[in-house]
Structures are given as structure tokens and as C-alpha cells.
Curated annotation (Swiss-Prot):
Record flagged with keyword Membrane: yes
Gene (UniProt): tdpA
Covalently lipidated residues, kind N-palmitoyl cysteine: C17
Disulfide bonds: none
Main location: membrane
Membrane topology: Lipid-anchor
Lipid sites, type S-diacylglycerol cysteine: C17
Record protein name field: 53 kDa membrane antigen A
Keyword set, alphabetical order: Cell membrane, Lipoprotein, Membrane, Palmitate, Signal
Compartment annotation: Cell membrane
One term under GO cellular component: plasma membrane
Domain of life: Bacteria
Organism of this sequence: Treponema denticola
Amino acid sequence: MKKKLFFALLVLILSSCSLFFQKEYGTITIDLEGGRARSINSSTGLPNLADSELEIDILTEGNSSIYKKILASEPKFFQADFPIGSRLEITVKLNGPSSSWSAHNSHTVKEGNNDIRLLLNKNASSLANVGFSTAAVVNKYEFNIAGKRIDINSRELPVFTRDSRGRLYIAYKDINWKLNRYESDGTPNNFASDSPILTTITGASSVNLASDPVTGKVYVAADSNLYRIKDDGAVTPTGGTAHPAGPIAVYNNNLFVLGVSAVSGNNPLKMFTITEEGSVLTLNQAGSLIPVSTGQITISTSGSETTINVDFKDILVKKDKIYILFAKNNLPTPSTPSPYYSLGGMLEYTYNSSGVIDNPQKYGFNDTVTAGDDIVTAGEANFYGPACFIGYDEQSISIADDGCTFKKEGGSVRIYKNVNRIFSFNTSTKSLYSYATENKWFNEYEETATPPPPLPVRLARSYCGRKIVIRGIPRSAYLSRVAQFVCKTL
């Protein structure tokens, strides 16, 4: 009897200890459609919650994580239990047709139900890559956004930007400059034909576009004048302040312009602060002009060195970094001397409120390259010809790489293959990786085929339906193929 009482007492003690040490849990609730999330709907140009995919990522103190994807057809509702006192880092991302909006909350779990307050940013946190290709027809380009094709006819290379809603703006030139706008799903949303923005750019010699991802404002540079493009097509001009003509980028009311120098060697990089007062933009230069050298790459050939002057292609700003793309090629033509190459790279500058710091970091190229057999090879890890920035997310930026490779045959160099790739650059780890794409970008280089050397006509004719008689030369399969080639041409 005593043994039974002792055993029962032991069980009771162990059960009490188990209850004493057991963790208590609280429930977190994420309810974007019926809870405390910022309203998002199509009337603002943003996607409907009910029609969009939602990703939830929860990181705990022990660095373990919970990931949940809620499909567009499912309610945007999530619940899970966590130990009381746990510190959670909660990130949600709402995915539209070609862009995403995110929200973040740091939360300590309390007893009972924990409603998580998430304010989705009004500006897109990531923009899916824009695809585009040069078409078989001269001066025709095919853009692709959210699976929809957009045909553009332009006598000059079209320029484009994406705004904070994921909308696509394309400036192009037929006789005069024009501007089209498309929703993030590719639906046209053009300006009225009499909009001030259209009359402003029509006669310009050059046009560049930029969007501020922080403020959501869109800008156009027509020649050396900057204008803000309002949603209805109205414009806000600068008050007589000119800036260098060239690629532009805007970030948090800071304008960055890479000018084109009249003297080969350095292009001026300038930073301005933008102030909008009433109906006028005011530009104030921040810091000193930074000379960006065009002599980024030196080619070593037989002991001599030649520095090539590259062309600057595009500029992008994220947080406190400025990214600049450049490219240059020398293609094999009868009038062009060797060495032949298709090269490029990216520069990264840092800036602050005082201006740009002149200490660029270099990615995707080598300062010095060596020519062999009249060819300079970039290498798979490097750029062949970066064309422009095509998208970004919170960790990386995407770049269109548009170049070609070469091959030497029979004493002459020919274009061997087109290189159409997308480079992804991680802005934190500074790592680059590339992958192939079906997009042709701005250029599709002609892949020249080298025919086999011709045989004497007498020899070719003797092969065409007759017996070949070649004294001292073996009748190999190679000679047969060569003779067949010549027969077709006779």
C-alpha cells in the first residue's frame, strides 16, 4: 500500500514539475484583408490584396524562420503560436504583376492574441526585371512586362524607367520624342495627346528618364532641363537651372547626373538636391564635381598597352550608393584593326549629404586585359557589354548584359556568339552572378560563318558526278565535304 502511495505521489510531483517548466504561448495574427494593414486597391494603381500573392517570413531569436506563401486566391490571413517573450522579426511581401510591396514589424510575443500591425509601403520595394529585345525590323523594339509584349518603333535607343507603383515609362523617337506609360500589368495608361509632358519633350535632342523610389516622383531630362512628370501629364520645370546632359538617377530628392565631357578622358558626375516650391523645381549642387574616367580598361598587346575610352550607359542609385555602367566593343570589319573585344563593367560610388566621395569600387571587369590571337576575352565572370539596369529588389540589382564573343579561323577573326545575359549584383555581399536570357537587348550581333577554303574548279568538277583524281593528296572526308560545298556554288 505504501509503495502505491509513494508511486502516486511521485507521478504527481513529476506532473507538477512538467507543468511548471512548460512554456506558455501567445498567438500572433496577421490579417491583411480584415485587420490592421494599410489599404491597397486598384484605384491607387496598386494591386488588390484579394488578387495578389502574399509571402510571410518570420525570424525568431534563435535564427530559425517560418516561411508561408499565401496564393492570390486564398485569404490573406495567418496565425501561429510562439513562446511568450519571444522576439520576432516579421516581414511580409505583397506581389503584384511586376512589382512587390513590403512591410516589416519587430514584435515581442505577449499572452493571448497578438494582432500584428503591418503598414505596407506605398512605394514598391522590388521591381521585376523588364525584358526587351531588338526586333528583326530596323528601329523596332519589343518590351515585355508581366508577360505582355509592347512594340516600340524608335530611331534612337528607347529609354525607360519604372515608378514606385511598378508602372513602366518608355520614351522613344520616331520623328519627335514621345512618351508612353503602362500599368504594372502591361496595360497602356498613356497621357492625353495635349499633355504638357508630351509637348515639352517633342523637340528635344536627348531625353532621359528617372524615378525616385523613395518619394515616388518621376522625372524627365530634356536636353539640360529637368522636369517632374505629374500623374496627369502636367510638368514642374526647373527655375532656369541647367544640368549636364546625360544619364540621370534620383533618390530621396537627390539628383545624380553623369554628363558627357567635351574633352575625352573624364565625364562629370554631379549631385544636386531637388526642392519643389510651388510650380518650380530648384536644383542646388551638393559637393564638388567628380571626374569619372573613360579610360577604365587597358589592353596589353605584345608588350604595349592601349587604354580604351568606354561609353557610359546607365546610372542607378540605391540608398547611399551610386552605380554606373559602361561598355565598349571593337568588332571585326575590314576597316577595323585588331584587337577585337566586347567589354564592360560597373562602378560603385558612395555619397552623403555633402556630395559624392571620389573612391569608386569596380565590379565585373579587369583593369588590364591581354589580347591573344587578335582577341580580348572578357571571361564568363565579367561583363561583355552592360546595357542598362532592368530591375531591383531589397538585396540586389539586375543588369542587362549585351555583347558577343569572337573566334579566329583561317587567319581572320569573326563574331562567334551573341551574349545575352542578366547579371544580378548583391548590394550587401558585393557578389555578381549571371544567367542566360532569351532577351536580345539592344543589339543582336551578326554571327559570321567562315566557309571552307575553295578547291580548284577542276578538282571540284571532277568530284561532281565523276571520279576524283588527286595525285599525292588523300581523299579524306574533309576534302569530300569541301568539294560538295564548291559543287553547290558552281
